[in-house]
Amino acid sequence: MNKSLKRTISAVLASAVMLTSMTGTQVFASADGTSVTATATAEKTYKVMSKSVPTYLFQYDKDAVMKTKLYFMNGVNDVPYIEIDDMVQYLKALMQMKYHGTYDLKVEKDGDTVTLTRETGYMATINFADDTIFYWDFDGFNTAESKTLIDVILTVWDTADGITGLKTVKSTERYGTPVTMNAADYGIDFVHKGNKYYIPLQTFSDIFLSPGKLGVALYNGRSLIFCRGEQAEFYVDGKYTQLGQVYYGKNGKYATNKISEELASFSACEFCFAMDNLYGLREKHSIDSFKTLLLQRESGYKLFSTKSKTIDRELHSIVTDVIDDRHTTYNMSSYASGVDYINTLDEKYGGGYAIETLADSFGAHRAERAKFYPDGVPAYEEVGDTAYITFDKFRMDMAYIDQLNYDDPSTIAGTFGAISYAVNKINRKDSPIKNVVLDLSCNTGGDADAAVFTIAAFLGKAGISVENSKSGALVTNYYKADTNFDGKYNSKDTLAGKGLNLFCLTSPVSFSCGNLVPCVFKEDPNVSIIGQKSSGGACTVGTISTATGAVMNISSNFRLSYTKNGSFYDVDQGAEPDYAISKLEHFYDREWLTNYIDSLA
């Protein structure tokens, strides 16, 4: 039999395995490109074993290492489960750690069901007979304490207004429909035995941690680590951090490239379960489901491989070749592949066409800007009658506000400092400024809080709409900004209503929040877009891990939108300029640009 035919047969067999595995019967598969093996169990009978493992919460502290008891079913010693009471304790601790609120969960056990009820009354019911998770209100259960149902800006508590310089002045809400997540459809079992209830650790990470932006859980067969899912937590400047030594092993010794059949099969199924429930742009990518996607891909069976590098390569390909939405990125390779395998994948296969196109545009714009500003572009600059405000990232950076001196531009730090300084200067007595340009031509996004602060400074009020693609919930929140941080929200805090000509300079680099801002401006008659079309990016970013130990960012269920005539429009298509600029040098030759803007008045 020739090699090509063997691979074809292998792919067909793997497809059958995936179909069986993801339709309710647990199947363990191995696919190395030439063969697939599978075993199935028809009944839910379990022998439960346990092991206590060292546990780390976002840092390495040898004096504060905890122990967590994990459970393993029927001798499969690398697919860990967590008992429901332990899961709840971690969920409460992580929610309180991140948001400092009054988060609490009440646990009610009744036969094969466990109901978790928030202090707000929102609940989730886990059915251990049907392997389902039911939410009366998915958003209400997962959100931090906030004034509105979905608030990607003030997601903490009422006193957040004083901390962020933002105030919610109005909101409209439309609640979503009940949500049921069916793990059984993916061959994932929840286990009820005696008076104990167990769910897979990876399901806990994907379905309970990720939606609340609480990080991810990683298990390498030795330790349990809760982390943000960023490589810098484990490896910096060619050296392992202490947490990296725990996860990847001393000098990367856990990089064996070996994964068991059972773990590979479970991880593939759980990945599909997570993406089908958490990825926010599925229908826009014509992905009916990720389990169908694996069947449609010639290489989809490789997620079932017993070689971790083969699995990581397929995950990398799905992220960069299929999804390729710039927000969805492959962040970390498996402990079994080694910390630097991500670099091998990026160097050999690239980061995806969309990201590489953005990087090329970013490089070209930065290089052109450097010709005019070799020492760096100032955050605030006046050229004739035109003020320019420039920053390349939106950052929620309130720490330096106390150091801001309106008479000293060197004290400007980050988005809040730049906007506060600019509003103060532009609104000063006898100001010569007639035109204001917000230069986002090299802005690739950042914190939504800072983007909303900027919009409110320009318009007087920022209206941001959010849609949850999973639940269907729709919310529009309106914010005001306190740009001088005096605790008052008034006309001194904004450029609106001052008779100024307001502009936003955009390019194909303007992405994510750098795209959200001009999209909101586009619908306001008082701001004109100049430059070139912005680059899209509609969703906030979520993070998930896989059971084999890789981590990726994904476009979450939360789609940022604007509202027009009562309808919601996401911002993924970008904003077309009102006045186009074709030559790159004209973006940064501010003498030319000022004269051009004056000619438009």
Describe the function of each predicted region.
Residues K6-M18, M22:
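Sec-dependent N-terminal signal peptides
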Residues E119-M123:
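Short Lys/Arg-enriched alpha/beta "domain-start" segment
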Residues M66-K109, G187-T203, S210-N220:
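Extracytoplasmic Gram-positive cell-surface binding/anchoring modules and repeats
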